[in-house]
UniProtKB/Swiss-Prot annotation:
Residue numbers covered by the propeptide annotation in the UniProt entry: 21-44
GO molecular function: toxin activity
Source organism of the structure: Lycosa singoriensis
Gene Ontology CC terms: extracellular region
Tissue/organ expression: Expressed by the venom gland.
Name of this protein: U3-lycotoxin-Ls1f
Family label: Belongs to the neurotoxin 19 (CSTX) family. 01 subfamily.
PROSITE patterns recorded: SPIDER_CSTX
Domain notes: The presence of a 'disulfide through disulfide knot' structurally defines this protein as a knottin.
Signal peptide as annotated in the record: 1-20
Disulfide bond among keywords: yes
Length: 115
């Protein structure tokens, strides 16, 4: 019985050590991947197309606003055959950003009152 108990404790110890090593490896891989994604996003942010500028060359190059990414919207001007594309923010996202800003301001006032 002592042998089985000793073997069980040894097995649990080895298993916990190996799982801790695997978790450390996964954490390091996730951290490296996250850093590379952040670097790519920063590089892309420098090349983005500002709001109301032409985005016909790359329809996914629109800049981000505070919360949401602008959308490349294409249309045909009246009396013209050429398609015009510009980066624009959809109205519903604009209203959502305004609501979030007002909620932040209200939260700041509450902190002043009770904080």
């Amino acid at each position: 019985m002592k042998f089985v108990l000793l073997f069980g404790v040894l097995l649990v110890t080895l298993f916990s050590y190996s799982s801790a090593e695997m978790l450390d490896d996964f954490d390091q891989a996730d951290e490296d991947e996250l850093l590379s994604l952040i670097e790519k996003e920063e590089a892309r942010a420098k090349e983005c197309t500002p709001r109301f500028y032409d985005c016909s060359h790359d329809r996914n190059s629109c800049c981000r606003s505070e919360l949401f990414k602008d959308v490349c919207t294409c249309f045909y001007p009246e009396g013209g055959d050429n398609e015009v594309c510009t980066c624009q923010q959809p109205k519903h996202l604009k209203y959502m950003e305004k609501a979030v800003d007002k909620a932040k301001k209200f939260g700041g006032k509450i902190k002043k009152w009770f904080g």
